[in-house]
A protein has these predicted regions:
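Selective for proline/serine-rich intrinsically disordered segments
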Residues: 4-7, 28-29, 75, 421
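Polar low-complexity intrinsically disordered regions enriched in Ser/Thr and small residues
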Residues: 8, 19, 388-391
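Outer membrane pore-forming secretion/assembly proteins and partners of Gram-negative envelopes
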Residues: 33-454
Length: 454
C-alpha cells in the first residue's frame, strides 16, 4: 500500500472565486503522494482556474482557515516548538522516514511536510561514514498566517516545504542542467494587433481610453515555465511572485510596506517618457559558497533576491525590441525592490516562498554538481525516484489578462518579465574555509543517530 499525505480541499466561495482551502488530512491510495500543506489552488494571492487563467484571489472567508491553523499548530511535536538556530535534516533519514510511512500505510506527518520548520539552508554536510547528506539551517515552530502561507510562529518567515524540496532535487538531477524560470509576456499576435491599432489613434485621446484599448488589443498574456513541472507548487510560487511584483511595480496595488512606491510614481513629470514595456525579473543574489578542503562541508551565503530591469520597445511592425538597458524610473524601482525585498518577504509571504525555492535550487544544484550523494554512497529513492514521493499537481498557469497603466507623461505601459533561477552559476563559485570542518563535526555530534532531524 502507498502512502498519500495529502490535503483535502474545503470549498469556500469568496468574491466570486471558488477557493480551495486545504486542511491537514490524509487518505490512502496509489500512487505514492506527499502533497504539502499550503499547496492549495490559491498560492501567493493568485488563483488559476481549470483553463489556466491566472487571476487575483481574495480570502475574505478566513473562518475556513481557522481549522487549518488549529490542526497545523496541534501537529507540531513538542521538541520543535522552540526556535532552533541550526536544525539538521538527514536526507537519508528523511527518505527512510517517508518509506516507513508508506510501508505502514500511514500519512506523512506535518513535521515532515514542513521539514521540521526549516526556514533557510545555510549548510550542506556530507558524512561518508554514515552514508548521509545533511541540510542545516535556522528553524522554528510554524503557523498558517492570514494569507494562507505556512510561516514561522515568531518571525513570520515562510518555512521550506517537502514538496518544493522534492521538485528542486529532481530538477537538479535531470539529464540536462536547466535554468528554472517563469515569464509573463504579451503574445506576438497581441503585439502586432496593438502596433496596427495604435497607428490609427488620433492625438489627444484620453490616456485611460488608450490604456483600455491597449489591454483589449494585447489580449491575454502568455505564462511560461521552464526547469520544473508547470503544475508544481514550485512553479506556482514563481508565477505568483512575478504577478505580485508587476502589480506593485505598475501601481495596480500598493506595496504592503512603506518606502516602495510604484515605478509609475518614480517617472518625473518633466522627463522623457519611460519605456512602453518595462521588463522586470527576479533572480537569486548569493555570495560565493564556502567549502572545506575535502568538499564535505559547504556553506550557502547571502541568499537574497534581486530585481533586474530592462526597457523593451515595440517597433512599427509589432516586434518587441530589447534596449539592453533600463530607463531611469524602471531601474530605480528595481533597486528599491532589491533593497526592500527582505521586508517585503515578511509582509507578502510569496516573496519569502520564492526565496526559499531559490535556496532549495542552490542546495540541490550543489548536491548534483559536487556528486555529494555519490561521496556519501547513499541513494534517495523516495525523494528522487520516479516511484517515490509524488509532488502536488495544481492547474498549470497558462495566461493572464493584460493590464496597462498610464504614466505621469500620459503614456500607456504594460510590463513583462518573470523569475530566473540559475543555481548552476552560483555553485560554480566557492572559497575554501578551514573553519567549516569543525562546524560539520559539531553538527554530527548533535544529531541523534537514526533520526531524520536533531
Amino acid at each position: 500500500m502507498s502512502v498519500r499525505g495529502s490535503l483535502i480541499p474545503h470549498i469556500a466561495r469568496a468574491a466570486g472565486f471558488v477557493l480551495l482551502m486545504l486542511t491537514l488530512a490524509a487518505s490512502l491510495c496509489p500512487p505514492a503522494r506527499a502533497q504539502v500543506i499550503g499547496t492549495q489552488s490559491a498560492v501567493g494571492g493568485v488563483l488559476v482556474d481549470a483553463d489556466g487563467m491566472l487571476t487575483r484571489a481574495t480570502l475574505d472567508d478566513l473562518g475556513k482557515l481557522e481549522q487549518a491553523r488549529r490542526e497545523l499548530t496541534d501537529a507540531i511535536p513538542e521538541d520543535l516548538r522552540q526556535t532552533n538556530q541550526l536544525l539538521k535534516i538527514s536526507l537519508r533519514g528523511l527518505d527512510e522516514a517517508i518509506a516507513r510511512c508508506r510501508d505502514r500505510g500511514e500519512p506523512l506527518p506535518a513535521e515532515i511536510l514542513c521539514l521540521g520548520g526549516l526556514q533557510k539552508i545555510r549548510y550542506v554536510f556530507v558524512y561518508p561514514d554514515e552514508n548521509d547528506v545533511v541540510l542545516a539551517g535556522p528553524a522554528e515552530a510554524w503557523k498558517v498566517n492570514r494569507q494562507g502561507a505556512i510561516v514561522g510562529a515568531t518571525t513570520g518567515r515562510p518555512v521550506l516545504l517537502l514538496d518544493d524540496l522534492v521538485t528542486a532535487l529532481r530538477a537538479a538531477n535531470g539529464s540536462v542542467r536547466t535554468v528554472i524560470s517563469c515569464s509573463i509576456d504579451p503574445t506576438a499576435d497581441g503585439l502586432r494587433r496593438w502596433a496596427s491599432f495604435r497607428q490609427g489613434l488620433r492625438p489627444g485621446l484620453d490616456p485611460q481610453t488608450v490604456a483600455m484599448a491597449m489591454e483589449r488589443q494585447l489580449g491575454p498574456q502568455e505564462i511560461s515555465v521552464t526547469g520544473v513541472p508547470e503544475s508544481s507548487h514550485y512553479a506556482r510560487v514563481m508565477v505568483a511572485a512575478d504577478y505580485r511584483m508587476k502589480s506593485i511595480g505598475m501601481g495596480f496595488e500598493p506595496a504592503p510596506i512603506p518606502g516602495l512606491p510604484s515605478a509609475m510614481d518614480l517617472v518625473p513629470s518633466r522627463s522623457r517618457a519611460a519605456a512602453n514595456m518595462p521588463r522586470w525579473w527576479l533572480a537569486p543574489d548569493y555570495e560565493p559558497l564556502l567549502r572545506d578542503a575535502e568538499g564535505l562541508s559547504w556553506e550557502i551565503r547571502g541568499g537574497s533576491v534581486k530585481a533586474m530591469a530592462e526597457s523593451d520597445f515595440l517597433d512599427g511592425a509589432g516586434s518587441r525590441r530589447h534596449s539592453g538597458k533600463a530607463d531611469p524610473a524602471s531601474q530605480r524601482w528595481a533597486n528599491l525592490m532589491t533593497e526592500r525585498y527582505d521586508d517585503l518577504a515578511l509582509a507578502d509571504p510569496v516573496f519569502g516562498q520564492l526565496r526559499n525555492c531559490m535556496d532549495l535550487a542552490v542546495a540541490s544544484a550543489l548536491i548534483a554538481k559536487e556528486n555529494l550523494l555519490e561521496k556519501a554512497q547513499v541513494s534517495l529513492p523516495m525523494l528522487m525516484g520516479s516511484a517515490g514521493v509524488q509532488t502536488a499537481s495544481l492547474p498549470a498557469p497558462k495566461q493572464v489578462a493584460s493590464r496597462a497603466q498610464v504614466t505621469r507623461k500620459n503614456r500607456a505601459m504594460v510590463a513583462c518579465g518573470g523569475v530566473e533561477i540559475n543555481p548552476w552559476t552560483i555553485v560554480e563559485h566557492a572559497e575554501t574555509s578551514d573553519a567549516l570542518a569543525a562546524v560539520r563535526t559539531e553538527a554530527a555530534l548533535e544529531r541523534p543517530a537514526g533520526n531524520w532531524r536533531d
